[in-house]
Design a protein with these regions (language model features):
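C-terminal capping alpha-helices of c-type cytochrome domains
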Residues: 84-104
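Generic structural signal for alpha-helix termini and adjacent loop/cap motifs
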Residues: 43, 72, 101-104
């Protein structure tokens, strides 16, 4: 009977590894995730309005802000709700993609 919990734990661990590998192997995933940000932060993260541009910002800064929005440490009108919809891995991908874009 002890083998069932061990097998279940191993299966969950393996699925997590497959999920992480699948995310890491898709070079366009960061871009796809970032597309949802374009309405407010502009195409490629270059805002045309009063909303902060994200293009060229340091990855660590974007990650920190997203985590602060997600935890509620940073107040916002919308971002605190949106950030909760992303996993930590997705936030890393988003931040990396925006950091690689050219600021204008």
């Amino acid at each position: 009977m002890r083998t069932i919990p061990i097998v279940m734990a191993a299966t969950v661990a393996a699925l997590g590894a497959v999920h992480a590998t699948a995310q890491g192997s898709d070079p366009n995933l960061g871009r796809s995730l970032a597309a949802t940000c374009a309405t407010c932060h502009g195409t490629n993260g270059v805002s045309v309005g009063e909303v902060e541009s994200l293009a060229g910002k340091p990855k660590d800064e974007i990650v920190r802000k997203m985590q602060d929005f997600k935890s509620g440490a940073k107040p916002a009108t919308v971002m605190h709700q949106l950030a909760k919809g992303y996993t930590d891995e997705q936030i890393q991908l988003l931040a990396g993609w925006f950091a690689a874009q050219k600021a204008k």
